[in-house]
Amino acid sequence: MTSTITRKEDGEGSVQVKQDPKAQIQEGALVIAVYGKGGIGKSTTSSNLSAAFSKLGKKVLQIGCDPKHDSTFTLTHKMVPTVIDILEEVDFHSEELRPEDFMFKGFNGVMCVESGGPPAGTGCGGYVTGQTVKLLKEHHLLEDTDVVIFDVLGDVVCGGFAAPLQHANYCLIVTANDFDSIFAMNRIVAAINAKAKNYKVRLGGVIANRSAELDQIEKFNERTGLKTMAHFRNVDAIRRSRLKKCTIFEMDSEEEGVVEVQNEYLSLAQKMIDNVEPLEAEPLKDREIFDLLGFD
C-alpha cells in the first residue's frame, strides 16, 4: 500500500511517495542525477560523461529514466530491453531474473540499465526508477560501483521524476544559452532545493550544451548562485556520434573538435571525482527571469 508523507517532511509544498529505505544506494558511490529541458542533450551528455569516468578508471553504471529508453544506446550501440519490460515478462517476480537480463555492458565497461516506464498516461515513472534501484540492490550490482549516473526524463519535476534526487549526491543541469532552457533550469533548481531539505542531494552545477556563448547562462548563474562546470559548443562531431550510435570517445580524433570535447568531458568527470563544492542557489520567480534575460 502506498503511503504519503506530510509536506514539511519532503520540502516546502511537496507531497511525495515515501521511499523504502532499503532502496537507497549505499554510501561510497558517487551518484549524479542529470536534469534539463527536454531535448537539450541530456542522454548524449550523460553517456559521454559515463564514458569519461570509465576512462579515468572508474566502474560506472548509467540508469536511463526515460520511457523512450534511449539513454544508453550510444554506450551499448543498440536499444536494450527495459527493466519494466523484463519484469512484465516474469509477472514481476524479480527473483526469476538474472543480471544479464536487464543490465548490459557498454563502451569501456560502462554498465547500462534502462528503467523504462509505464504506458503514456498511466502509472508513475518514479516508481519504476525506485524498482530499478531495488532490483540492482537485490542482485548486489551496486556494491562495486564507483559512479552511478541517472539520466532523467525532460524537465518534469513532479514527485515521480524527482525520484532520482532521493539517491543522488549531486545534480547537474544541462542547459543551452537560451531563455527556454534557463527557464526550465530555474524550475529544476527549485525542485532540488525542496529535496535537499531532507535528502543528501546538492546542486553540482551547470553544463552548457550546444552553446557558442555563455552570456545568458552566466547572467542567470550570477543572480542565483549557480556555476558552469563544463561548456560544450555546437560541435558537429557530437551530433554525428549519436547518429553513429557511439560516444564521443569512439569518434576519430582527427575530426574537428573531437579532442576538445573529449578533454572537456574528462575535465568535468575529474571535477566531480575531486568532490565538487555543493552550490547554494536560489531560484528566481518567473517574472524575474523574464526581466533578467534577453536584450533591451
From Swiss-Prot:
Keywords: 4Fe-4S, ATP-binding, Chlorophyll biosynthesis, Iron, Iron-sulfur, Magnesium, Metal-binding, Nucleotide-binding, Oxidoreductase, Photosynthesis. The keyword Oxidoreductase applies. PROSITE patterns: NIFH_FRXC_1, NIFH_FRXC_2, NIFH_FRXC_3. The keyword Zinc-finger does not apply. Mg(2+) binds at residue 43. Its EC number is 1.3.7.7. GO terms for biological process: light-independent chlorophyll biosynthetic process; photosynthesis, dark reaction. HAMAP family: ChlL_BchL (MF_00355). Homodimer. Protochlorophyllide reductase is composed of three subunits; ChlL, ChlN and ChlB. This is Light-independent protochlorophyllide reductase iron-sulfur ATP-binding protein. It comes from Prochlorococcus marinus (strain NATL2A).
